[in-house]
Amino acid sequence: MFLAAAAFLLSAPASASQGDKEPVYRDCVKHCVRANCTGARLRGFQSTQPPYMALTGWTCRDDCRYQCMWTTVGLYQAEGYSIPQFHGKWPFARFLCFEEPASALASLLNGLACLLMLLRYRSAVPCQSPMYHTITAFSLVSLNAWFWSTVFHTRDTYLTEKMDYFCASAVILYSIYLCCVRTLGLRRPAISSMVGVLLILAFTSHVSYLTFVSFDYGYNMAANASIGIINLLWWLCWCWLNRRILPYWWRCGMVVLLLHGLALLELLDFPPLFWVLDAHAVWHLSTVPVHFLFYSFLIDDSLHLLNTEKPGVKLD
């Protein structure tokens, strides 16, 4: 429902942080680039760089920034100061080409869980079920978002950051459409069609503003959070109204409450344990099991709709 979406509502990286503002860090980067990233030294770096690093776009300057980050962290620790952030992020120990190994792994696990449960849904629910195609499309949108989340946590670039944020917004907006179809659209298809058009226009405007006007992290977070709250209240209202009719309603309510409760983990925002596991990674990891509960609800609900879709029978 909101699995891919909820994982992005609170995070809003800054363009500059305490660590990368430090003169020692900036001087280190300048010296490293001058000494290693020109002429024969640059060719030497490129010839010895592992293929997986080159394929993921790691440059000599990027490597200088990485090495100087740890030099600065070491100085902070030696003086007894708290660990600073660099370019809006905590310092992470790189593993192979993965900038944030734990978050990348967690995003991959979420994607695999989503794929596994989509396949289970398609094998358990006939395509004649009223929600079949809407749920399948939502799952594909979610899979795309988890793919780009994995890519972004593997390698943070201008493109991967934008795709991560835009695809997360797509999931949030599509989750509104999914909610609308399930609660209103089955009896009044015109309403869901109208809402679908409005959501497409909203997504187009949102992406256009962030791309061509200003990539405003605060605006992006506020917009996504607002839609997420609407989604939360809409689903909880539906669950409450159907609690005596649908025996599986609690699964939907549990998923909604779990996701928004688990999102509070992001507020902890501590330096990564062992330079790998931070609050964001813990948050991502905690959402993996929720896919199974969510799709259990979707399967039961889709089968219920299939069995009650008869002339004169009201769809809940």
Curated annotation (Swiss-Prot):
GO BP annotations listed: brain morphogenesis; GPI anchor biosynthetic process; GPI anchor metabolic process
Gene Ontology cellular component terms for the protein in this record: endoplasmic reticulum membrane; Golgi membrane
Topology in the lipid bilayer: Multi-pass membrane protein
Main localization, broad class: Golgi
MF terms in GO: hydrolase activity, acting on ester bonds
Glycosylated residue positions: 36
Lumenal topology ranges: 20-97, 153-165, 216-220, 276-278
Pfam families linked to this entry: Per1 (PF04080)
InterPro entries, A to Z: Per1-like
Recorded family membership: Belongs to the PGAP3 family.
Protein name, entry field: GPI-specific phospholipase A2-like PGAP3
Organism: Danio rerio (Zebrafish)
